[in-house]
Amino acid sequence: MDILIFVTAAAHLVYTPFTKVEESFNLQAMHDILYLRNNFTQYDHHDYPGVVPRTFIGPLVVSIISAPFVLLFETLSINKFWAQYVVRLVLAGAISVAWNSLRQAVTKIYGVEVRLWFTAITITQFHFMFYMTRPLPNIFALPIVLFAIAYWLRDQHKPFIICSGISILVFRSELALFLGILLVVSLLRRKVSIDGLLKVALPAGVCILAATVLVDSFFWRRLLWPEGEVLWYNTVLNKSSNWGTSPFLWYFYSALPRAMGASLVLVPIGVALEPRIRPLVLSALLFVLLYSILPHKELRFIIYVFPVLNIAAACACQRIWMNSAKSTWHSFLALACGAHLLLNVFITLFLLVISGTNYPGGAALSRLHRLEAGTSNVSVHISNLAAQSGVSRFMEINNEWTYSKDETMNYTQADLVAYTHLLVEAKNKQNTELWASLQNEFDTLEFIDCFNSIGIQYNSLLPVRIKTKPCIGILKKRPVAPKEASKTKEKIAKTKTYPVEKETLLAPVKEFPKVIGDPKMKSRLQVDADDDDGIVSTVEEMSLELETDTEPHAGAETIETPLKEINFQELRTLALGQATKKSRAATKMKIRQIIEQHYRAKGKQIENDSAETQKTQGKAGLRQSVKSIIKQEKIKEMIEQIATMDLTRICDLERTSTKDCLKQVIDKIDDSEGLKSK
């Protein structure tokens, strides 16, 4: 039965594979460690740091264990969404090992029968099994706490103190209450002395604190003790209440009944019948009582006490079952103990079905991947609700797609130009006008439902019904005729003033797939400076449409656009395919600006020559203007070529700036394509 706990947790994971915003830091951290590796500047936490910093130690350990599986997936070209299963199963495996250690301690103290009941009760409850695969700070602390409790039951106080220190200083500072109470009990029972405590606690505490400060300061780029900042924010400043408050006794009348299910009624019976369990259970309940002082409450905050209470319930079941032959009443009670497990299973199935409707964002992006399978150059914007309810970097499985979680999105016409698809909150009273405007340009492919409420149905075998409502809409931009597109661009140009660093006179760049290890990519990174064929990549010919809005504005040649400096590392990261979607777009925008600026500098002479030619040659001058427009269209191809080059093979970057090197490359490509005006 030992493997059952892991298998049950895995079943919960398969049914609910997505995650919520509370899990995002650890999940994104594991993704970045596994896929971005030493490209630390592109890690997700730099763009989305969260309210308080969290430790990287948990994600780092899980990622190290998961790395061989992820490398195998990459070798077999298995998309990285399956790697999310791997890291979460590794976390569940760690908890299973720790839980098994606790189970062995229970066997040694209370007997084999209690162990069997303990296992049966645990796997039939919902919340403990469900949270085993959730990458939350509390869950990273859970296996260490289970080891600590097991050591405490065995009176092995040195490893108990070390495990307590790790869980408190690295993961969850509030565990000082629970594990501190257990330590006080040991001191009062004289199972450990103060001298012995200090000899272990002081050096262990210093080493543990130094480890978390060293590791996390490196990843966060500042001197940092993450759990110290969390403690200050939640406890001293009491700002955790910004995320909601609950009544003082909420843990007792809401969290514990839901987590324990029918087993809760057996806990006091177990405490009454088994004196040896009382110190542990009372310590756990005292921890819950003290922790109730903080107004912000969540069930996962007290998940560490569930196994302790289950031991008490198992003791009750064992005593009742052992006496089942004494009388009819005892037989009935024994039958009730077995039946309560079946009731737990029904509660678990009901809660699991509800839980499956709580991740509309993940379901929406997964559905979009199926709907648009085989479609390239997709740019999808992920709304805030979608990002908080299931979307993670593990779901960015298509290298030809652009995934954006831009929080400044206002859904204006200018904002929507960049996107082909939207995951947007479904229509409600607050966003009626938004949906009215979106339906002018986008078609609704599907709606993804999420949990709404629980209803009662009297004319059905199942009296309880789970009600859902549309939460996320999947939208796709309608194809636009060239003339309409031209009018739209003119309208946008009149109504919106672009920031200087985003200003452009050209159509948006099409995204091309970037695959690390692609032979074509490698050949591009190894070109020589005098090899025109190497510099000029073979790209698919783009259709060239002469649009009325491609002509520069009057006086444009006199304006020198200020640029954010582009550096070699940005280009190198882009060429190797290691850049994030956000940084890749920013780097390409800088390349585009340099090309436009360089062309404007050359374009003055071209325009003057063209004007003189038109006076003398008429139609020949007109053909020259057409060539100039075609040249502007070719810039889109040029950006893609530059994005795959290794500039160290072309320029001496110790003597030449990156910007000047890019200008040399532009001229080289320009010459090879025959685009220069003659």
Swiss-Prot record:
Mannosyltransferase that operates in the biosynthetic pathway of dolichol-linked oligosaccharides, the glycan precursors employed in protein asparagine (N)-glycosylation. The assembly of dolichol-linked oligosaccharides begins on the cytosolic side of the endoplasmic reticulum membrane and finishes in its lumen. The sequential addition of sugars to dolichol pyrophosphate produces dolichol-linked oligosaccharides containing fourteen sugars, including two GlcNAcs, nine mannoses and three glucoses. It comes from the Eukaryota. It is found in: Endoplasmic reticulum membrane. Pathway: Protein modification; protein glycosylation. The gene is Alg12. The chain crosses the membrane at residues 1-21, 56-76, 81-101, 109-129, 133-153, 168-188, 200-220, 252-272, 279-299, 301-321, 334-354. It holds the Pfam family Glyco_transf_22. It is a multi-pass membrane protein. It is an enzyme of class 2 (transferase). Keywords: Endoplasmic reticulum, Glycosyltransferase, Membrane, Transferase, Transmembrane, Transmembrane helix. It catalyses: an alpha-D-Man-(1->2)-alpha-D-Man-(1->2)-alpha-D-Man-(1->3)-[alpha-D-Man-(1->2)-alpha-D-Man-(1->3)-alpha-D-Man-(1->6)]-beta-D-Man-(1->4)-beta-D-GlcNAc-(1->4)-alpha-D-GlcNAc-diphospho-di-trans,poly-cis-dolichol + a di-trans,poly-cis-dolichyl beta-D-mannosyl phosphate = an alpha-D-Man-(1->2)-alpha-D-Man-(1->2)-alpha-D-Man-(1->3)-[alpha-D-Man-(1->2)-alpha-D-Man-(1->3)-[alpha-D-Man-(1->6)]-alpha-D-Man-(1->6)]-beta-D-Man-(1->4)-beta-D-GlcNAc-(1->4)-alpha-D-GlcNAc-diphospho-di-trans,poly-cis-dolichol + a di-trans,poly-cis-dolichyl phosphate + H(+). The keyword Protease does not apply. This is Dol-P-Man:Man(7)GlcNAc(2)-PP-Dol alpha-1,6-mannosyltransferase. It comes from Drosophila melanogaster. GO terms for biological process: dolichol-linked oligosaccharide biosynthetic process; protein glycosylation; protein N-linked glycosylation. Its main location: endoplasmic reticulum. GO terms for molecular function: alpha-1,6-mannosyltransferase activity; dolichyl-P-Man:Man(7)GlcNAc(2)-PP-dolichol alpha-1,6-mannosyltransferase. One of its GO terms (cellular component) is endoplasmic reticulum membrane. Belongs to the glycosyltransferase 22 family. Its EC number is 2.4.1.260.
